[in-house]
C-alpha cells in the first residue's frame, strides 16, 4: 500500500540536492482522496520551521483543478509540471541559420557550462538550488550520458560556437518516470538549455525538433519532461512543441512558515 505521508532527506553531496531542497515532505495524492482533510492532518506532521532547505510537495494530475483551492489555502504554489508529448505530434519549422551536431566527450566542459546556465535561470522559480558542488556533479552525470552506446546529447551551433545543449534518456534510462507515462515505451527529455545571449534565436527549437525526430524513429511512444511552471520561457516553448501538462507539483518552501503568506489568507481583498 502506498504511504500517504512520507519524508526524505537528500545528501548535500549529490546532484539530487540541486533539483530540490535537502529535506522533503510528500503527500501522495490518490483518486478519490479527501485532500482538504489530508492537508489538515499533514500540517501537524511537518517539520523545518522557516528552513529554506525543506519543502512540502503534493503532485496531482494537472486536470484535477478541484484540488487547487485547498492547496492554495494551505500556501502551496504550482511550481513544476510533468509534461508529455505523444509520438508524431507536429513541430514548428526549424530555423535554417542554426546548425546541430552530436556532442562528444570533447564537449564536456561546454555541456556543463550550458547546463549551469539552465540551473541558474531555473533557480528563480522555487525548486532548483545551485550548490557549491553542482558543477562537479553535473560533470559526472553528463560524462555518463556521453559514454552511452548511442547518441543522446546534441549541441546547437551559431557558426562554430555551441550555444545550446539537449540530452535525452532513452527508455532504458527513463524507468524512474514509469508512473507518469501514459504510453510505452517512453523516454525522458532531461535537459534543454540555451546560452542567455542566444535565447530567441531558434537554437532550442532546432535541438527539440531533432530530438523528437530521433525519438519518433526509435519507436518511442511518449516523451516526458519536467519544466518550471512560472518560467516565462519554458512554459510557452514546450506547449508549442506538442507537450501537454500531465502532473503538477504543488510546493510550499519552507515546509513550515512562521508567517502563512498571502496565499494562505482566506479573506477577500478589499474591493472598495
Model-derived regions: residue spans:
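Acyl-donor-binding surface of acyltransferase catalytic domains
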Residues: 29-97, 247-255
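Conserved acetyl-CoA-binding loop-helix of GNAT-fold acetyltransferases
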Residues: 32-48, 191-194, 200-213, 217, ...
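Conserved active-site alpha-helix within GNAT-family acetyltransferase domains
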Residues: 62-78, 205, 217-218, 228-247
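A short helix-loop-beta-strand connector motif used in the catalytic cores of GNAT acetyltransferases and
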Residues: 1, 140-155, 164, 171, ...
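Conserved hydrophobic beta-strand within the GNAT/NAT acetyltransferase core sheet
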Residues: 56-59, 189, 223-227
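A short beta-loop-alpha structural element at the N-terminal edge
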Residues: 99-114
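Conserved donor-binding loop and adjoining core beta-sheet/short helix segment
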Residues: 1-42, 163-185
Amino acid at each position: 500500500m502506498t504511504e500517504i505521508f512520507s519524508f526524505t532527506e537528500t545528501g548535500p553531496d549529490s546532484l539530487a540536492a540541486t533539483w530540490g531542497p535537502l529535506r522533503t515532505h510528500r503527500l501522495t495524492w490518490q483518486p478519490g482522496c479527501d485532500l482538504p482533510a489530508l492537508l489538515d492532518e499533514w500540517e501537524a506532521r511537518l517539520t523545518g520551521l522557516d528552513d529554506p532547505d525543506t519543502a512540502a510537495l503534493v503532485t496531482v494530475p494537472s486536470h484535477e483543478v478541484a484540488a487547487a483551492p485547498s492547496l492554495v489555502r494551505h500556501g502551496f504554489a504550482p511550481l513544476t509540471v510533468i509534461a508529455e508529448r505523444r509520438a508524431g505530434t507536429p513541430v514548428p519549422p526549424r530555423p535554417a541559420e542554426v546548425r546541430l551536431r552530436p556532442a562528444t566527450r570533447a564537449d564536456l566542459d561546454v555541456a556543463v557550462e550550458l547546463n549551469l546556465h539552465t540551473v541558474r535561470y531555473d533557480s528563480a522559480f522555487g525548486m532548483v538550488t545551485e550548490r557549491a558542488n553542482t558543477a562537479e556533479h553535473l560533470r559526472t552525470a553528463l560524462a555518463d550520458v556521453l559514454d552511452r552506446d548511442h547518441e543522446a546529447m546534441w549541441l546547437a551551433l551559431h557558426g562554430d560556437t555551441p550555444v545550446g545543449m539537449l540530452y535525452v534518456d532513452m527508455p532504458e534510462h527513463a524507468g524512474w518516470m514509469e508512473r507518469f507515462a501514459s504510453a510505452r515505451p517512453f523516454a525522458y527529455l532531461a535537459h534543454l538549455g540555451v546560452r542567455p545571449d542566444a535565447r530567441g534565436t531558434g537554437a532550442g527549437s532546432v535541438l527539440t525538433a531533432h530530438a523528437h525526430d530521433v525519438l519518433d524513429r526509435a519507436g518511442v511512444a511518449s516523451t516526458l519532461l519536467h519544466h518550471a511552471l512560472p518560467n516565462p520561457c519554458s512554459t510557452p516553448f514546450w506547449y508549442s512543441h506538442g507537450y501537454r501538462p500531465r502532473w503538477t507539483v504543488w510546493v510550499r518552501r519552507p515546509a513550515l512558515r512562521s508567517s502563512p503568506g498571502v496565499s494562505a489568507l482566506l479573506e477577500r481583498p478589499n474591493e472598495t
